[in-house]
From Swiss-Prot:
Any single biological process term in GO: mitochondrial fission
Originating species: Rattus norvegicus (Rat)
Region (Required for induction of mitochondrial fragmentation): 226-373
Gene name linked to the record: Ggnbp1
Bias (Polar residues) ranges: 36-49
Protein name listed in UniProt: Gametogenetin-binding protein 1
Amino acid sequence: MAAQARTPRSRILGCSSMLRFLRSLVGSKGSSKSSNRPLNRSQPSSSPEQDVVSPTMGHQGGCGRKETRPRVLSATSSNGKREPRPRVLSAAPSNQRLRDASGLGTGDTGSQTLTSKDVLKLRAQGVEVTSVPTRGTWEVLEHLPEKKGEEGEPAGEVSGASDRAHFGQALEAEQGCLQWVSGPMVLPPEAFIKEEEDEHCLIDFGDLRLSSCKVGSTPWNYLLGLYKQLQKSAMTKAQRPDADAPQFALKDSSPTEERGEREEAVDESSLKWCAPRASSDDSNLKWCAPRNSTYQSPLQKTFRSTDTVGFVESELKKILAVQREARLWKVGNPEGRELLTQPDITLEEAGMVDGQHLLLEEMDEMGNWPPPE
């Protein structure tokens, strides 16, 4: 009866005390939700679940608004022990810097999928991370502590802030070092130009074919070099005496020759021409130039025994370029030298025999003949 006889004021006071109690409960729940709470060790559900969190990166690398609150479910293994489940996080674009590797403000870590073509498996206390295997990433990840903690310990408490910092450095090194190019390898056309230039070229100009044309030489330069080589070979052949032509050796006008033939000693200024001997086999006269002769050797001239003295004298003047008056002597006979004064007689009629010579004597500048010896 006393409870039923309560006044409205007492009811209002009771409701207010109840409201204060509820407010205190709600406030404690809200504060516990805002703090870093440990992982829920509830029983696993029949189907495996994974909470997906996609943080939005700002211009300075900070994490933005989170779409869903991450949940961590611990699975129970066959032996009754609980094992933490991996998390899957969607990371920001590769050109932005990641300061928090896990993408969460809390202490739990997860796994990030960077790009579809990069694969890296990092195992740190039940957490799987897929990323790109680069050299810089491996060097950073080698220093990550891999500790085997208790099987039922939450994953966020095991990794800690140091793991997140190391993993963030690995991602930064990966973004700076990794540059993969998809598709087939494309070679620029400049790579084939050098190979074509290194090859030998074949130039066809009608009947003239030039092969093995090296790099850096133009066809004109090659033709010019070929012409110079042909010119040199032609000059070399021209300097050689002809095998079919008769060979005439030049002899010095000395008193005694190697063959024992005696030649009359005369003044060198008057000595212009010498015919060594008349051969009876071919009826030809062979001659030699004296030592003081300024003409280049070999000088070749053939006279027959039927040629006249005047013809021989005129030919010798042309060859020796004698401008003044000259006369022809026959030397080598026992009586001494003999002057040939009849230009109409032949050499055979003049008595030219084997062992005799012809001497062309020129008048000096004063118009005098050289004195006889």
